[in-house]
Amino acid sequence: MGANVLIMAGGTGGHVFPALACAREFQARGYTVHWLGTPRGIENELVPAAGLELHRINASGLRGKGKLSLLKAPLMLLKSVWQARAIMRRLKPVCVVGFGGYVTGPGGLAAKLAGVPVIVHEQNAVAGTANRLLVPFAARVCEAFPDTFTLSDSRRTTGNPVRSELFLETSRPALAGRKARLLILGGSLGAEPLNKLLPEALAQVAADLRPEVFHQAGKNHDEVTAERYRAAGVDAQVQPFIKDMAQAYGWADLVVCRAGA
């Protein structure tokens, strides 16, 4: 067993999938990878399925919360940092790598207090709150897009880690004699503009020219999106989340998606 590395990422696929790609690279180099997340995010499904050990702390955001929650916030942050610190005492990681999500803030602070090097990776052009707060403490700051962290002397523009299975060549039948295949992606949480506008737009395409549709609508948005397709008279396969994205990419001729990691 190699030295331990602790990945911190949670909440959405935009944080978790690049972190999974990074985790695989650490494993290929002989490290043992552990994961720090929360009890509620998508990491609870994806990380154990990837064969990685998931450790959880109680961490959440403050947006949209009431005054009582804001008053409790300092105490909750201290509790989250203490939980993360206890995990790090046990694992003794050689470094922690934060990809964003609520878990990254207290996890990164705990690592700094423990003297563990912190690496930050930001997947988007505009950095999230947790990653921005960790930049002053980070030994290395990685950005997918140039100039996301213009004030950091330790920044490196690395791009986004991509899982190796997405590079596998796939064969699909020629378009002649079949309908085109359209994949619609709004992220793991969905994108309401795509969920609302695509059924309306596809209804205006002649039925004999209309593509096959596979639509990732996001958690809690799949039923209403499927109903929109039915009301528009458009056949579509709608799912809240696509687990096998490599297969979906291999199936599709065209992808409509929103920006994001």
What do these predicted ranges mean?
Residues G41, L46, A50, S171-C257:
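Donor-nucleotide binding loops and adjacent catalytic segments primarily
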Residues T32, I42, E53, K112-S171:
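Active-site-proximal region of nucleotide-activated glycan assembly enzymes
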Residues H15-F26:
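Short amphipathic alpha-helix
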Residues K72-I87, Q239-K243, R258:
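Glycine-rich, highly charged phosphate/nucleotide-binding loops
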Residues N4-G10, R29-K79, K219-H221:
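Conserved nucleotide-sugar phosphate-binding/catalytic loop shared by glycosyltransferases and other
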Residues Q83-V97, T104-I119, R132-P136:
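Glycosyltransferases and closely related glycan-assembly transferases
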Residues G100-G101, P146, G187, G218, ...:
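Short glycine-/small-residue-rich Rossmann-like dinucleotide-binding loops
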